[in-house]
């Protein structure tokens, strides 16, 4: 029987991972299609994603179907998402005595009435999972505290497509991008992502009004704060762009900003924008509440510039500093490229390999002892 990997959508940056898992383990990807709050509009067409997937994938129709997964699959991998989907996947694995693996992205306890009421259940899932696959070292530390041990936790380094983001971008491509999007001449600062409070959009716009160096803030993405971006002097909103164009935007930018802030329900799990920018040699400015910072990819003054969240003055100062210091930008670009080179899909898949092997072994021991 195949292995079930439960997720919400087929994000394009997960395709190389899911393809490897299908080839190695006969994994089938089951999509429940929820969690729209954290999913960009430009890849919410789940039916199209499933139709185009180069690996076995189908819809998962709610908790009731999830409860029966143990009848059809040898093991179940599920994320910390989807409301009742996670406990249903865990219950199914235990009911049918299958290995259960948690794909963990949370690294700070969410604060809400719902999370408070369900905390005993989530604590049980953390502790009883046969193995945990963590987004990074920061998530591993959080999960280890919940489990009381770091045994059985495997870090799967977050990866993006090198053929898109690490490729050489020509000056002609940059010139064409500028002309196509009517960008003024001069330095550019780049933001890529959803335009929502937790991504620090309001902080970024406040900071931009304080930046002293003449430059253009180029914003790629959409969301409820799009109008605020459009009305900010010196900011140009491009909306959503094809992923194939993003490398040119990163190559154009003197720096890429990732100003995420914590909220009661959200702490940036990773921010793959950091990987994308570093692959292209665009120095990153990120806050301490970005997973790529807490997880060790973006290291202050080594592979990027790190600031406190929610501090527009600090963000403006960091932007001015990078715009004024070409040598610093060059040093961070070289170090960033070297650091992100180890964040590959093969390394990510190996973590799943190890986790599946350990989970299968543990479940086998538990069966023999019961």
Regions found by a protein language model. Name each.
Residues 251-269, 282:
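Acidic donor-binding loop of glycosyltransferase active sites
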Residues 227-247, 255:
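Nucleotide-activated donor-binding/catalytic signature segment of Leloir-type glycosyltransferases, i.e.
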Residues 179, 314, 321, 328-342:
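A short, well-ordered alpha-helix in the C-terminal region of glycosyltransferases
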Residues 240, 299-301, 305-312, 321-327:
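Conserved acidic donor-binding segment of nucleotide-sugar-dependent glycosyltransferases
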Residues 84, 98-116, 128-131, 162:
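A short, histidine- and acid-enriched strand-loop-helix "catalytic/donor-clamping" loop
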Residues 183-199, 205-209:
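Conserved donor-binding/catalytic core segment of Leloir-type glycosyltransferases
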Residues 258, 274, 279-288, 298:
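Short hydrophobic beta-strand element within catalytic cores of glycosyltransferases
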Residues 123, 127-176, 183-184, 238:
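Donor nucleotide-sugar binding/catalytic pocket of nucleotide-sugar-dependent glycosyltransferases
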